[in-house]
Every structure is written in C-alpha cells, then in structure tokens.
Amino acid sequence: MLGTVKMEGHESNDWNSYYADTQEAYSSVPVSNMNSGLGSMNSMNTYMTMNTMTTSGNMTPASFNMSYANTGLGAGLSPGAVAGMPGASAGAMNSMTAAGVTAMGTALSPGGMGSMGAQPATSMNGLGPYAAAMNPCMSPMAYAPSNLGRSRAGGGGDAKTFKRSYPHAKPPYSYISLITMAIQQAPSKMLTLSEIYQWIMDLFPYYRQNQQRWQNSIRHSLSFNDCFVKVARSPDKPGKGSYWTLHPDSGNMFENGCYLRRQKRFKCEKQPGAGGGSGGGGSKGGPESRKDPSGPGNPSAESPLHRGVHGKASQLEGAPAPGPAASPQTLDHSGATATGGASELKSPASSSAPPISSGPGALASVPPSHPAHGLAPHESQLHLKGDPHYSFNHPFSINNLMSSSEQQHKLDFKAYEQALQYSPYGATLPASLPLGSASVATRSPIEPSALEPAYYQGVYSRPVLNTS
C-alpha cells in the first residue's frame, strides 16, 4: 500500500487549521504494529489509518455498546467504525481523535487480518463477515419481543370493539315475522305503525340502531303483503295513524308457532272491504282496463287503417285507405286517370289497392295506357317496396304531417340534390322536372311525360336511395 496520500486542492496552512498534525501527507500504520492489545492505536491521529481493519461483521456486544457509552470518542464515531475491535481495545481508543475513525468500516482491506495479534485475529476469524446476522444487537428481530408485546397490549383493547355480544346480534326473523309477532301479542290484535316499531325495539336491541333502514322495510312489508290489513281508527280511539291487523283469512302462516320460516305465502283472491285490500284490487283491474282499447271488440282494431298496414298495399304505395271519407276521392281519380281499366280496379282482386292520389305527396299514378295488372312489372321501380323511408302515402309518414308547401319543397330539394350528384340520372330527366322553390306555384302544369314510370325510375331508383 502507498506510504503517503497526497491531498489535493489545499495548502499546508489550510490543513493545519483542521488537524493538529502539520504534515500534509498522512502515513498509514503497518499491520505489524498492531498487537493483541492494539496499543499502537494510541498514536493514531488520522482518519486513513484503519484501512487494514476488516469488515464490520465481527461486532461484539461490548464493542457495540462502547461506541455509545465511551465519552472519549468523538461525534464521528460510528458502530461500523469499531466493528473489528474486540472488547479489550476499548481503553486504547480513548486517545483517538474524532476524525480518525470516520473511515473505518466495511470498505477497509481484509488482508490485514493475518498480521494482527492472536487475540484480535482469533476473534475476527472466528466470527467471520456473517457475524452481524448472528449478533442480537444488529438483528431486526432484536426488537421483536417488545413490538409483539406492544401489539398484544394494543390489540387487547380493540378486541372488545369487534366482538359483538349475543343479545345485540341480528334476530333470525323476517320483517313479516316480526310484524306478525307484534300484532298477535297485542290484546286487541291490531297495532299502529309506531307501536310496531316500539315493540320490535323493546324486544330486539339490534333494531335500536339504523332505525330508518329497517323501518322502511317494515312499511313496505305492511303495504305489499295481503296478510296485513289496514284498519281505520274508530271515533272512540282518536289519534294519529291507522291500525294494522292480520287478514282474517290468512290463518296460521307460521307452522307450530315457529316464526323462523313461513309455511305459505298468503294471497288474497277476493277484494276485501279494507283499505289495503281495495288498493290491491284496484291495481289488478288496471291492466284489464288498459287492454280494452286493443281488444277484438274495438272497432279501431278492425279499421281499414289497421288492416292495410300488413297488406299488399303497404308494398305498392306504402299506405292503406285513410278512411271511408277518402273513398269518393278514390273513385273520382280512378275514373279520371284509369278509364280503360276502371272495371278491373274495382274487382275483388284489386279491392285492396290504395287510392291513386290520396294526398299532395302522391307522385305515383297509373297512366291511361297501363291497366291495373300492369302495376306488377313496375312494382320494384315505382314504389320501392321494402323502403319505408320513401313510401310517401303512409298515414304516419312525415310527408302527410307536413303542409303541402313544405312537402313540395322537400321533394324539390331532393330532386335538385340528385340532379347535381348523379349526372347520368340528371341528364335523362325531362325538362319539366321541378327544380327550385318556384315550382310550388307552378306545380299543376306538369306534363304527362313527367308522370311516366321512367321519370320516377330515374329520380327515385334503388341505387340513388341506397347511397343517400
């Protein structure tokens, strides 16, 4: 090992103010100078001289306690600094300065152990570097007995708070059982709601806490079970609240007086005269009264509007006949537009056909050259069956709910949009195609060619609708 260590960045006079020795270089103590009593430590003044001492594994209780009890050691003395010293060297360390022991510890060279005297070498080699784990002073379990005792002392007081005595446990009775017991023990066999609460709290201390929760459950049990009947107060018993009693037909719901489990659920079949039962009977009659409008005897269920929704007319025009008032209009339009096939339109086979023009939004009409049986080839082109958004004559469609001007404006806008987006279709449109809001006033002089199937095929064809 080097004999001297050069300190950098300081002059000699600076170090003189820190240390008593005026030397700038600090010499190391040879291992041979260390005898069994470690007497050579009396002359050590530096903090780099203990580098031959080995690890802190060989700490004895005497040396550990000495580090805190010896007043001659300075503030820089640590338990690791005196780890390699046996108890016999405690007196020899009194002359060491505070800075002379700060570097003693685990990083020191273990090679100096062989040159030490018999007593220190034997002590250090015998214990080895693992002695710290065996030393009770350094082991974490050294404080285990006191910690365990403290935890037992603290847990003894907490055990009483978690342990619940048997009288305060929740009783194994349902709320119906509690109400039945309270009513049956009363002399008059009926109690008010507050009296039922009081009886339960007097008998079962568990229900003296969280009163709002279980009292709500008591009220629900009284209201929703037919075995409990509300009895109005008599004039000779003034007070607040009605009485509750057991239904006379409920019988013995609990077998052999055991209230742990009900034998059967009581269901009141007939309407009793009591207030609680009449409320239940009124609720039963409610669904029947709601079913009457949809019953078979209701004429609205058999109206043409109801029948036409599921018929063939929903596929052709998307709307049945609105009512009997529209039938004259249907006949007039049939005679005006379908003169050649009027008799065929009135036949039973085509009796379910809708009106040809029953509203302002009706665009599809049968031309004179086509008879009634000619609707089938153009069914997929004109009327777009299966597309509910464009069945304009549906009675509940948005077109029939709108005014004629708004409806025409909507159709004009759709035709204008399609003419811009789909040029092949817009190029084949006739010149009379209404484009713009000005066509509202000039709607009547539409040419007959605009009503041809090819016109509607170009405007409202399947590819256009699917992409919109």
Curated annotation (Swiss-Prot):
UniProt region (Essential for DNA binding), positions on chain: 251-288
Recorded GO MF terms: chromatin binding; DNA binding; DNA-binding transcription factor activity; protein domain specific binding; RNA polymerase II cis-regulatory region sequence-specific DNA binding; sequence-specific DNA binding
Signal sequence bounds: none
Biased composition (Gly residues): 273-285
Biased composition (Low complexity): 318-328, 347-365
Presence of the UniProt keyword DNA-binding in the record: yes
Subunit structure: Binds DNA as a monomer. Interacts with FOXA2. Interacts with NKX2-1. Interacts with HDAC7. Interacts with the histone H3-H4 heterodimer. Associates with nucleosomes containing histone H2A. Interacts with AR. Interacts with NR0B2.
Identification of the protein by name: Hepatocyte nuclear factor 3-alpha
Organism: Mus musculus
Name of the gene encoding the protein in the UniProt record: Foxa1
